[in-house]
Amino acid sequence: MKSVRFRDDGGYTRDGTWENGTIKFCGKSYEVDEVEILPPSNPSKIIATGFNYEDLIDRLDVKTPNRPRLFFKTPNTITSHNKIAEVPAGLSAVYEGEIGVIIGKQCRNVKVGEEREYIAGFTCVDDIAIAEELEDDPGAVRKSGFDTATPIGPVMASMDLVPECPDMEIRINGKVERSTNFSGQLFSMGEILAEITKYITLEPGDIFTTGTPIEPGLVSDGDIVEIYIEGIETLRHGIRLAK
């Protein structure tokens, strides 16, 4: 099943299902562009993973991590389908298509192999990052923590719908820029969850990512970014470079 949170024309927040591009709720059908699509969950925290794919590590010639390389993204970074991500003034940015893993129930000290008990489903994530090298920013607060830096959505797809290594396609203004899949992980979803929950309690709705398998691509003011992940849907958002 693909669940979707949306705001109807009466201003009410609804939890519907996404069926072939149409939203269903209580016997009514809505076209996607008729309603405001909301983030698929309201996380108290987002934990992102960097440099988790062998091909990307080889391309960028960075040191292979010995354990998942994690960093925080706070709720202010979230925006949703069909919204605008605004990059701080004077800076440029890159897109990074990723799988977002949505937690279904509170968890701590999860063991590898137990992860499916705690995962509600998957969504698309664009972990937008500042392109410039920023000094004195070891936790990526400036680089990846600015408002609207994390478009997510449009749905939460149940685990049975998403292959183990799904295909991903990224389009900019309708043109395919990247086409790849999520094979070649250094650390599996279960290993990442185990590492996070060794230290941190995750709550329902919290999200972690498994990282991007592709080299980030530069975006321009006014661009429309689309991230398709097999089994989920296509996340679409705009880019604004603040003046």
Where are the predicted features?
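Solvent-exposed alpha-helices and their adjacent loops that cap or buttress functional pockets
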Residues: 7-8, 38-41, 62-64, 70, ...
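Short acidic/polar capping segments at secondary-structure boundaries
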Residues: 52, 76-77, 104-109, 125-131, ...
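Catalytic-pocket segment enriched in acidic/His residues
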Residues: 17-19, 33-40, 56, 86, ...
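N-terminal non-catalytic cap/leader segment that marks the start of a structured domain
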Residues: 1-68, 159, 171, 175, ...
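Structural signature of FAD isoalloxazine-binding scaffolds in flavoprotein oxidoreductases
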Residues: 63-81, 95, 226-230
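RNA pseudouridine synthases
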Residues: 96-125
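Structural motif
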Residues: 44-47, 68-70, 76-77, 98-100, ...
